[in-house]
Amino acid sequence: PVNRRPNIPAALGDNDIKFDDEDTDVKFWGLYYSELLSWGDLGELYYFGLDEDDSSGRFTHNRELSTIGLRLYRKPQTSRFDYELEVAFQFGESRASPLSSDIADLDHLTHFGHAELGYSFLHDWHPRLIGQYDFASGDDDPIDGENERFDTLFGARRFDFGPTSIY
């Protein structure tokens, strides 16, 4: 990741020029494969790796996580059912807090699931009815030396009122 410069409002307002800084204490990488399946739907396999360490002025959970997942879906079409199914498993190590005094690495083993079923109606304004279900593991014992809470890595893309696209 890159730390954008300048990052001070006065310097931005003055149109100051500064080189961006690369943050080598956070590394994110991945592999992605997509395939048109024999019955016409789409399938995806993916792997994401995250390795982050504390740096001066920025404390982290020191996450060293691997996420593997599978997604199957059919794109919405008029007068036809569509769906999306996704499962992901996450493993590695992380810490309970970003505090510099927290030096205990916790085992990290979690999972996530998503299911969606929709139908697009034949009408001038193209209405679509959809039902969604998400599940993610949680940490049932915060003092057992394990972190069982699924980590979205960089936060939810949309959390205000679900996938309404209002904002």
For each feature predicted by the language model, list its residue ranges.
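Signature for the C-terminal beta-barrel architecture of outer-membrane proteins
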Residues: P1-E146
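Flexible glycine-rich, low-complexity coil/linker segments exposed to the extracellular/periplasmic environment
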Residues: D144-Y167
